């Protein structure tokens, strides 16, 4: 009989400016945990346009910063960022670009991954941001998966959520459909991770 610890953890890695992407991460973690699998939520520090450091190594509050070891040892990955001119934030991109050692080792090959985002408007670049976050995951050899239309909330949502990934339109709290889509996405990554591990 396999225990929860046998399956490792799903890393939910995000950057959030105003808390919206963090809220998505928390809902995704509920979906992961519903499969008796650990959801490990991590964030990345804000980067600055000036040379001196503006962030300490340990955040003052909230989720702790992700390390390369967190990324290396995950059984599956969810990556989230607010939309910045139709692409991911510089802070998240900076962290992902520091993972070349894992690319050389093939540490993330054949692990499932998904993406999520938040924007200030419905046509604020959500889909292009989701696609931009998929690119480094594909280079790492990960198995990128979105949300199928068998998830009913995907056809009903009037705000965020797409087959490319979970999302939110800012201006109010997450809608019930957005929450359902996040949970379904987290659950799907966890189920795929368990299934792939059982094949090894």
Where are these regions (language model features)?
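N-terminal beta1-alpha1-beta2 submodule of the flavodoxin-like/Rossmannoid cofactor-binding fold
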Residues: 1-105, 168-200
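Alpha-helix boundary/capping detector
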Residues: 97-100, 104, 121, 139, ...
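Short, charged/polar low-complexity linear motifs in solvent-exposed/disordered segments
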Residues: 105, 127, 133, 163-164, ...
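Short, glycine-/small-residue-rich phosphate/pyrophosphate-handling segment
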Residues: 109-158
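Gly/Ser/Thr-rich helix-start
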Residues: 20, 77, 81, 87, ...
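Short, flexible, mixed-charge acidic loops at enzyme active sites
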Residues: 54-56, 155-167
